[in-house]
């Protein structure tokens, strides 16, 4: 309805050759002034040299002549327009939802989107920081696909450089400690996961490398490849346990092996040499300073391979319309330089970067700390032992990506209406149980009169708006908020309405069916089961 009203107003302005800026046209949901309200006449009256009340009245007359299923339109000084939806429109909304079923809320945007997320270094188990990026990325991909886009989910493996050297040294030292006292490198990873990896390595190779040194290139190569493989397999297993999938795992080291880094940098403009190093003039394109691509010792920087990686994505066979990267907030200093690099070849408009904030985990009022370096990492494995997948996905996604998440294990595990996820699943289970024991007559005309019915139906229709909004602002938490509001409205409706035996029973059952459909569709986008019973 909101879209219909907007389109009718735009059509009116164009037919009358009046000035309108469509981006400033606002149709707001209203509680006190009809179902929807707009100040469009106030905004554009001056530009069109028309009195705002007169313009509002003219718009009203035109829209009443359109087939918009509006019961009435009222004008309020100095030019507000209030729209009241026809009772028939509420019936139409419920019928539409039931008819479309699992397709209600879908669009056909048909953009190709490369979505890169998680991309954790294969130097240990996934922890809560990685978890948030994983959940955000997976849910966003679900919603973008539901909106008719083609989404390519990519995990970038940072398997090149100093962090991998540190991993090899750490695992090798822990392996040696199986046989004898052996010192850890100064920059060693200290987590239990490194000890676990060394033991895995021992199960495969026994004492084959007991007397080896990392100066032995063959030994170094085996420790490097096997350590990465062991951790990457665990990362994939953790993601699978959260129902998170990828289309491809891309390797940084593979970019170097196939000389794609060198080839992409060779065609990069605004490159210059200074102090025996090779630089990119990113300061010309919004970065704070120029950045080194190749150090004076000939070593490529991480930035150089990252540029190549982005060019490879853009020029891939998938041919994406744009890229979305989901990074931790600690990468904030990296955003400007990456966008600047793409600006050098006029591709910056193809990249959106989401920076998500930290997760703090609480249990019994105490916060768990996370530090892979200090051996106190709280991993996804640990969390899955305390709460289930559905709870993890809901509570990790219920805040905007740019806000801190405080994950309360006690609340997430609580079987109570205080738990928002339980409340939503309870509403779905209530609807499912009622419908399982009842029959809807689809041929009967639907009728909705009571205020709690029309409010609930209006909320159902908002599902389409929420989905579309998320495709534009990427704030997946809007879906959590919406589902909670819908569940609360339905639970109130259910508790305060006599449904079975009501003279309008068929309509109320149909409304219940519509609620069940929308709750299920929304939960599916979150990757959460819609429970039939609790």
UniProtKB/Swiss-Prot annotation:
Keyword flag ATP-binding: yes
Pfam families: Arg_tRNA_synt_N (PF03485), DALR_1 (PF05746), tRNA-synt_1d (PF00750)
Name of this protein: Arginine--tRNA ligase
Organism domain of life: Bacteria
Binding partners and assembly: Monomer.
Enzyme Commission numbers on file: 6.1.1.19
Keywords: Aminoacyl-tRNA synthetase, ATP-binding, Cytoplasm, Ligase, Nucleotide-binding, Protein biosynthesis
Compartments, record wording: Cytoplasm
Family: Belongs to the class-I aminoacyl-tRNA synthetase family.
Motif position, 'HIGH' region: 120-130
NCBIfam families linked to this entry: argS
């Amino acid at each position: 309805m909101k879209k219909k009203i907007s389109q009718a107003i735009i059509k009116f302005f164009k037919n009358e050759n009046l000035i309108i800026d469509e981006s400033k046209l606002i149709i707001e949901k209203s509680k006190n002034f009809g179902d929807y309200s707009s100040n469009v006449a106030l905004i554009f009256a001056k530009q069109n040299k028309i009195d705002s009340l007169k313009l509002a009245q003219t718009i009203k007359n035109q829209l009443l002549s359109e087939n918009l299923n509006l019961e009435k339109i009222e004008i309020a000084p100095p030019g507000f327009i209030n729209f009241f939806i026809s009772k028939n429109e509420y019936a139409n909304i419920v019928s539409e939802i039931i008819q479309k079923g699992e397709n209600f809320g879908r669009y056909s945007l048909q953009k190709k989107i490369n979505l890169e997320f998680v991309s954790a270094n294969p130097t240990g188990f996934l922890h809560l920081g990685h978890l948030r990026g994983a959940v955000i990325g997976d849910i966003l991909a679900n919603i973008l696909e539901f909106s008719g886009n083609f989404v390519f989910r990519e995990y970038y493996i940072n398997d090149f450089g100093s962090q991998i050297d540190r991993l090899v040294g750490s695992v090798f030292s822990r392996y040696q400690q199986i046989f004898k006292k052996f010192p850890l490198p100064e920059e060693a990873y200290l987590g239990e996961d490194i000890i676990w990896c060394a033991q895995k390595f021992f199960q495969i190779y026994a004492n084959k490398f007991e007397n080896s040194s990392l100066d032995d290139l063959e030994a170094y190569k085996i420790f490097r490849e096997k350590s990465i493989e062991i951790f990457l397999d665990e990362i994939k297993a953790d993601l699978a346990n959260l129902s998170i999938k990828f289309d491809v795992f891309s390797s940084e080291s593979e970019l170097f092996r196939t000389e794609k880094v060198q080839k992409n940098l060779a065609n990069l403009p605004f490159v210059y040499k200074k102090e025996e190093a090779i630089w990119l003039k990113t300061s010309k394109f919004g970065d704070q300073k120029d950045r080194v691509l190749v150090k004076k010792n000939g070593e490529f920087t991480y930035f150089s391979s990252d540029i190549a990686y982005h060019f490879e994505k853009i020029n891939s066979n998938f041919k994406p319309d744009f890229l979305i990267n989901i990074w931790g907030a600690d990468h904030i200093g990296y955003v400007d330089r990456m966008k600047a690099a793409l600006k050098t070849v006029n591709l910056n408009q193809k990249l959106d970067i989401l920076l998500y904030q930290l997760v703090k985990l609480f249990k019994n009022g105490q916060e768990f700390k996370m530090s892979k370096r200090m051996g106190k990492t709280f991993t996804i494995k640990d969390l899955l032992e305390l709460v289930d997948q559905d709870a993890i996905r809901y509570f990790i996604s219920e805040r905007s990506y740019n806000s801190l998440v405080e994950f309360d294990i006690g609340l997430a595990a609580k079987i109570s209406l205080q738990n928002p996820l339980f409340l939503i699943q309870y509403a779905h289970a209530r609807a499912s149980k009622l419908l399982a024991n009842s029959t809807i007559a689809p041929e009967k005309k639907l009728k909705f009169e009571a205020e709690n019915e029309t409010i609930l139906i209006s909320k159902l229709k908002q599902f389409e708006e929420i989905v579309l909004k998320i495709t534009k602002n990427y704030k997946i938490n809007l879906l959590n908020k919406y589902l909670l509001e819908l569940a609360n409205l339905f639970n109130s409706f259910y508790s305060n309405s006599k449904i079975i035996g009501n003279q309008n029973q068929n309509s109320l059952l149909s409304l219940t069916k519509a609620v069940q459909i929308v709750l299920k569709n929304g939960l599916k986008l979150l990757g959460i089961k819609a429970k039939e019973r609790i």
